[in-house]
């Protein structure tokens, strides 16, 4: 039986909007969805453009800002009304998001940077893309993994700070992989060259291309508060040398077994003008219109695509986990 996820997200948003002056717990928001937080969080984020935790905090602060301008309530009363533990806590959160204190915001006398409630009619369907979708099964694989996490993400510049964590995760994983592949070929006792030479070695040997390796990334964990963000990166390993694997050490690299799974896939562009978010949204909509499949519970993935003779990533392939509709 197909689940109407759009309706469930609307129900979640309605619950949040009706409880902004209360402590909003994730479990209460999800009560009507009957899905785990990791599963539903990704669907919510791709539709709405914000994690549930960030959406709640931005809406609370925006409603508080409106009351600063439109009412004569004291700042402490507004802080307590929106469930902040003290005026000091409210001041820090408000200043972190709006860039000025609640008092200065009130004195300016104008609403600015207000985060409005999400509206599907205005914000969802106009961004859908006509995309080709393929059904693919990823086979089990062994991967090297690096996980980057920041528990102090600033709400105002959250996207930029998240991008820093993603870059950090990829940088550390790729540095380990280059060292691993070099010493696998030349021996663990051979001195490692500079990073630029390691990169040239990888490209010359085509060690950065399928089927030799593939690169996947995903958000991990799903944040339990608006200041958390984590990203995990994978590099597929082939022809694994257990000896070299133990010799080439790098902090926080973990070797994992991935079980594989069934996916709906589509491609997205890379770079500053990437259509990644729109393609994810369009993949969701494709699945909602498809009666043969429903969401699967296995890992969501973004494959980062490489090119022959060039370093870096050049496009995405998105993997939406699916299962046959029961």
Predicted features and spans:
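Short, flexible segments with low predicted structural confidence
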Residues: 1-3, 11-12, 27, 37, ...
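A short, Lys/Arg-enriched amphipathic alpha-helix from helix-turn-helix/homeodomain DNA-binding modules
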Residues: 2-24, 57-73
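Short amphipathic alpha-helical segments
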Residues: 10, 27, 167-171
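Basic/polar phosphate-binding segments, predominantly the helix-turn-helix DNA-binding elements
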Residues: 23-56, 79-101
